[in-house]
């Protein structure tokens, strides 16, 4: 197998107009469904004051973007954002698995600051 890097790299860049993905976008997981490719990816926000950490932090959300060709992604949306105590400091590094017609997403959730394994 030969893998060739796209001449259009990077295929996804931060979008300053979306504060939730304005700092960085990376670690994507592509999914093919219904003749489209969806990229589920980690999105890093601009630094902002986080009251629970008592400091400025960049928080990760998970975004999703569809594509017809796997290179040009449009209509990007926030897919998963921290809303539970166990993910209050970020949702990161998504992985998606399709099993018997259902899609399951796994991701890292950050519940503490400074970050540590629990």
Named regions from a protein language model:
Residues 1-23, 27-89, 97-118:
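Beta-rich carbohydrate-recognition and catalytic domains
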């Amino acid at each position: 197998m030969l893998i060739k890097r796209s001449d259009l790299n990077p295929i996804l860049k931060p979008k300053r107009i979306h504060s939730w993905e304005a700092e960085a976008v990376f670690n994507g997981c592509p999914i093919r469904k219904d003749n489209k490719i969806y990229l589920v990816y980690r999105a890093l926000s601009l630094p902002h004051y986080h009251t629970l950490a008592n400091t400025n932090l960049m928080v990760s959300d998970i975004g999703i973007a569809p594509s017809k060709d796997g290179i040009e992604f449009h209509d990007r949306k926030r897919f998963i954002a921290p809303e539970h105590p166990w993910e209050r400091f970020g949702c990161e590094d998504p992985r998606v698995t399709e099993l018997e017609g259902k899609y399951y997403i796994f991701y890292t959730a950050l519940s503490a600051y400074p970050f540590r394994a629990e």
